[in-house]
Amino acid sequence: MNTIGPHGEGAFEKRHVGEEEFLLVLDELVAALRANGAPFAFIGGIASAVMGRPRPTLDMDVMVRPWEAGAVLRALGDAGFETQETFPHWLFKAARRDVVADVIFLSTGDIHLDDEMLARVLRRAFMGRMLPIVAPEDLLVMKALAHSEETPRYWYDGLSLVARSDLDWDYLLRRARHGPRCVLSFLLFARTAGLVVPAGAVRSLRRLVATGRLAA
């Protein structure tokens, strides 16, 4: 296992690689994760490409349970990846042949791969491979909460999820408890873009923001 301390450079810098190389490393990543046995699901650019809008991505974002992140990183190291405990409270990295995988175990709003999210994980095709992908509702909430000046693409990824996915609005509202103000702001933004957002969902989020309870 080749582990590097926090904030190391070199192998963990994101670089443009060819599609063939990217997919080869993806296959190796998935094989190592499946051999380890801990549940995982893809988020980030791969999930957005599957369920929303295709866009270029330089890395792979995979979510694991917080208490299994260390074992997952060790398994990737044993499989030949260079590994890094980048931010020990939420993010590790693994790299191979100039392709970086972000191993995320805590997202903005204290979102983690809990039982509710795991129960909704989907198997979807990506570039000829069947991968576990988080549900579009979970991805949308994560995109809404992680939006910043440096990552405006996250909300545009979210717009594509509203436009292209048949969302379970009741489930989305339950997951919105991690950041109801951000999710409400995003859904109002989606309306300005001409997308259909149920009025009941907006009312429920306004109530959640105001009172801490969802509308009946």
Predicted feature locations:
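Compositionally biased terminal segments of proteins
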Residues: 1-216
